[in-house]
Swiss-Prot record:
Protein name, entry field: Ribosome-binding factor A
Gene Ontology CC annotation, any one: cytosol
Cellular compartments annotated: Cytoplasm
Entry function: One of several proteins that assist in the late maturation steps of the functional core of the 30S ribosomal subunit. Associates with free 30S ribosomal subunits (but not with 30S subunits that are part of 70S ribosomes or polysomes). Required for efficient processing of 16S rRNA. May interact with the 5'-terminal helix region of 16S rRNA.
HAMAP family with a match to the protein in the record: RbfA (MF_00003)
InterPro entries associated with the record: KH_dom-like_a/b, RbfA, RbfA_dom_sf, Ribosome-bd_factorA_CS
Signal peptide: none
Organism: Shewanella sp. (strain MR-4)
Assembly and oligomerization: Monomer. Binds 30S ribosomal subunits, but not 50S ribosomal subunits or 70S ribosomes.
Composition bias, Acidic residues: 130-146
Gene Ontology BP term (one): maturation of SSU-rRNA
Keyword Ion transport recorded: no
Amino acid sequence: MAKEFSRTRRIGQQLQQELAVVLQRDMKDPRIGFVTVNDVDVSRDLSYAKVFVTFFEEDKEVVQEKLNALIAAAPYIRTLVAGRMKLRVMPEIRFVYDSSLVEGMRMSNLVSQVINSDKAKQQQFGSADDVTENDIDEADDTEGKA
């Protein structure tokens, strides 16, 4: 029977927590700003860790600048995290921008716009939901006479 949580997954979760703390408390680089660590994928041999991050910025150039600053600081961040974790070999950290949060917000906004548009059209033209029982009775009467 396989373990419910593999060692790489547990290390990834701990690495995510430690990275979040280090990025929030120990990094003083103003180029980075506020960073959210969404997920960490650790390779099976524990040599690499792909760190998915997001920023509270929508401008692609600003996001790329922040990501480049993180990539440049990766060896220093790795050293800080290695001091906090009890691993024989600390994985090499590779930062990747996670656009899923931004895409999810964009999709949510699109759905909200469509819902608001539908509500406006229903108010303007009426809807099938506005049919009363009198309308149904009148329709039945006209069908019976024909």
